[in-house]
Amino acid sequence: MVARSEEIVIVEEDTTAKCLMLLSRVGECGGGCGGDERVFRCKTCLKEFSSFQALGGHRASHKKLINSDNPSLLGSLSNKKTKTSHPCPICGVKFPMGQALGGHMRRHRNEKVSGSLVTRSFLPETTTVTALKKFSSGKRVACLDLDLDSMESLVNWKLELGRTISWS
């Protein structure tokens, strides 16, 4: 007759051996798999993908030009892209997308908010801001002169927050 402690050790060894056997077969198609792996196929080009998400991303690339054989449609689409620009009504900077203009407009709104944000009024009078310059690329950039004279020019700046910053 086998002692109780020996029986527990044998059961644990068997369980461990079974677990190791299962782990060694990870990736193989054994038992319940049946070779029935799911494949997602693109209806346009018949390319196959392992996940629905990958297929969805691929399908989006087919939808860029629906009627590419119609030259009048292609011409109107290309003309529309070049004509579309979104100018800022405040400073005149043009953006290729409305979303970029929206982010830019946030800057103008933040300048107008009083009591919660520091605005341009904290700059000393000696700081110069040059006008927007237009380069050959068609983009406008602001040129700021950041050459401050010394720390004395920074003393006692009055901010719109009502506080005074002073360095001693």
Curated annotation (Swiss-Prot):
PROSITE patterns per the UniProt record, alphabetical: ZINC_FINGER_C2H2_1, ZINC_FINGER_C2H2_2
Q: Which domain of life is it from?
A: Eukaryota
Mind telling me which Pfam families this protein's record contains?
zf-C2H2_6
Q: Under the cellular component aspect of Gene Ontology, which terms does the record hold?
A: nucleus
Q: Which GO terms describe its molecular function?
A: DNA-binding transcription factor activity; zinc ion binding
User: Induction: what does the entry report?
Assistant: By H(2)O(2), heat stress, wounding and cucumber mosaic virus (CMV).
The record's account of tissue expression is: Expressed in roots, stems and leaves.
* Signal peptide (from-to): none
Question: Which cysteine pairs are joined by S-S bonds?
Answer: none
Q: What GO terms in the biological process aspect are recorded for it?
A: cellular response to hypoxia; negative regulation of growth; regulation of DNA-templated transcription; response to oxidative stress
The alphabetized UniProt keywords are: Metal-binding, Nucleus, Repeat, Transcription, Transcription regulation, Zinc, Zinc-finger
As for subcellular location, the record says:
Nucleus
- Zinc fingers (C2H2-type): give the ranges: 40-62, 86-108
Q: Which SMART domains match?
A: ZnF_C2H2
Q: Does the keyword Lipid biosynthesis apply?
A: no
Q: Cross-referenced InterPro entries, in alphabetical order? A: Znf_C2H2_sf, Znf_C2H2_type
Under the heading PANTHER family, the entry gives: ZINC FINGER PROTEIN ZAT5 (PTHR26374), ZINC FINGER PROTEIN ZAT7-RELATED (PTHR26374:SF388)
Give the note: Plants overexpressing ZAT7 show retarded growth and development, and enhanced tolerance to oxidative stress.
Q: What does this protein do?
A: Probable transcription factor involved in oxidative stress response.
Q: What is this protein called?
A: Zinc finger protein ZAT7
Q: Which gene is annotated as encoding this protein in its UniProt record?
A: ZAT7
